[in-house]
Amino acid sequence: MKTPKALGRPPRTKASANGDSTREQLLAVAETVFAKHGFAGASFRTLGSAAGLSNAAILYYFPSKKKLYAAVLARVEESFRAGLIALDFSGEPPERVRRIVDYQLAWGRQNPAYVQIMMRDLVENRDRIPYARKMAMEESMSIIRRAYLDLHATGRLGDIDPTMLQYVVSGAIIYFQVAFPTVSRLVGSPDWHDLERNFTATIHAMLRCCIGGS
């Protein structure tokens, strides 16, 4: 039996399905373009050329570049948050923080374009921050901050500020994943897997030192 909500919903047409497909295609292309050029460097001409759409077609789905960029940032947040909230948050605070770190590393490895978008947004959004109604990744960072605050509440961080530790670790992960080619060249290690293993081990060793060797 159809629910009242279903009865009140207009039937899905072929045109609306095609529109959804075009919108998704545009968003997928926009992810690549924004990852490469950032918000400031991505023009409608570049976006349209990559997507095979006219400026008018892009404006049909997104009335401005800001709206398109906001939709891309929302997809980045949704992707990261979906995996984050699926983590097992049982156990002691140190173990919860370790799981979060492992997830951040794995997510970044699987979503390199999203990591590039995040890094570019951090660099470019300084002037927009005072006027932003909602910051990118705000919900996810709040979830992570809670884990670090719980860790601090155990007394094992001493004088270390839990929020600053969160951003030191998260920032190091993002920078490493974005700057891998440069880091690889500087340290003379072209093997991504070997370099990532060393980086992961270093992050966890640093956390153990902060937590008191746990």
Each PLM stretch: what is its role?
Residues 23, 31, 35, 70, ...:
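Solvent-exposed, non-membrane alpha-helical residues enriched in polar/charged side chains
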Residues 119-149:
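A contiguous binding-surface segment within folded domains or other stable secondary-structure elements
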Residues 22-25, 29, 33-67, 71:
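Helix-turn-helix
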Residues 1-10, 106, 110, 138-154, ...:
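C-terminal peripheral helix-coil segments that are non-catalytic and often amphipathic
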